[in-house]
């Protein structure tokens, strides 16, 4: 059953799938929504939609077959339009430097080393073999890794990806071929860069801002072709992720911090030009809710676009009126070609 897109033609076969089988179908996509009786009733009556994970604050991550997504929105109507995930990509090093994140390292008088604190990263993963994340005895300062791209021992209530504990990471480090034990790799390097800046151990005159803090890292699953095409992302664009997977990454880190009974700082080095940027999207509201909890801080660089004019605003005074907004389209953006 797993991985067979033709099973979408058989409602009975879909009903008999486990949640993990359903989620891992190649033509199933995720969405996020506020939980409600109306949504639950729709899911109960429709075999092509499942609720996967309940999140703090009354939010859920759901899954639907791609060719049923528009039907889902149409039948649940306008209050559910925001269920479609927003696309995020990586903030570059220059943006992080401009936000003064790296300058935290230059405050030795503070004498804050992060002992007893967890650092969480929702990004491209982490190179767990890097010396910046090893103690003097060669063991890892990484408590957990969740690789959303690998099938394996998925976290509780997530139903996809593979998680690795500190014990498993140490087993990998002690072996001749670490990646045969823990196959997670940060092929981009962005997540490793952020983690080393924030929590790298002292190594060759280099030291992170909180070298005694331990780490939980999430390697995000890239956005599907279905989501990229809908948002007119140019062909060949890489390192693009969806807000539903980011929200799940945050939940994973929070769950592990609760298990360890330790405070956590979660770093999200991602940004987007989609949406209103007014704090009212589902992911923004979710993060705002999480930030009210004691012992939890979520931080994100805001970018360095200044007056790049990626957003506009206006007011339509009455129903039936219209306004025209001119859009300047860059070169080689084929989705906006005339």
How would you name each of these model-derived features?
Residues 108-242:
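Subtilisin-like serine protease catalytic core
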């Amino acid at each position: 059953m797993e991985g067979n897109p033709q099973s979408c033609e058989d409602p009975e076969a879909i009903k008999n799938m486990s949640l993990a089988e359903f989620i891992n179908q190649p033509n199933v996509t995720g969405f996020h929504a506020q939980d409600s009786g109306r949504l639950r009733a729709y899911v109960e009556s429709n075999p092509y939609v499942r609720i996967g994970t309940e999140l703090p604050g009354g939010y859920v991550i759901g899954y639907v077959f791609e060719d049923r997504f528009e039907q889902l929105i149409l039948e649940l109507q306008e209050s559910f339009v925001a269920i479609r995930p927003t696309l995020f990509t990586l903030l570059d090093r220059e943006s992080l430097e401009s936000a003064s994140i790296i300058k935290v390292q230059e405050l030795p008088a503070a004498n804050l080393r992060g002992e007893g604190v967890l650092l969480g990263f929702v990004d491209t993963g982490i190179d767990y073999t890097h010396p910046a994340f090893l103690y003097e005895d060669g063991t890892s300062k990484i408590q957990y890794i969740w690789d959303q791209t690998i099938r394996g021992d998925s976290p509780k209530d997530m139903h996809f990806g593979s998680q690795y504990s500190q014990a498993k990471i140490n087993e990998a480090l002690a072996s001749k071929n670490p990646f045969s034990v823990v196959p997670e790799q940060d092929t981009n390097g962005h997540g490793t860069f952020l983690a080393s800046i924030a929590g790298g151990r002292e190594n060759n005159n280099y030291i992170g801002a909180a070298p005694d803090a331990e780490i939980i890292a999430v390697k995000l699953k890239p956005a599907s072709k279905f989501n990229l095409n809908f948002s007119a992302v140019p062909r060949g664009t890489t390192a693009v992720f969806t807000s539903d997977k980011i929200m799940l990454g945050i939940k994973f880190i929070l769950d592990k911090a609760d298990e360890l009974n330790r405070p956590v700082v979660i770093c999200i080095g991602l940004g987007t030009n989609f949406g209103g940027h007014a704090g009212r999207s589902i992911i923004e509201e979710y993060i705002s809710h999480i930030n009210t909890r004691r012992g939890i801080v979520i931080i994100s660089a805001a970018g360095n676009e200044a007056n790049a004019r990626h957003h506009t605003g206006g007011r339509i005074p009455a129903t039936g009126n219209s306004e025209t907004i001119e859009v300047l389209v860059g070169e080689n953006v084929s989705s906006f070609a005339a």
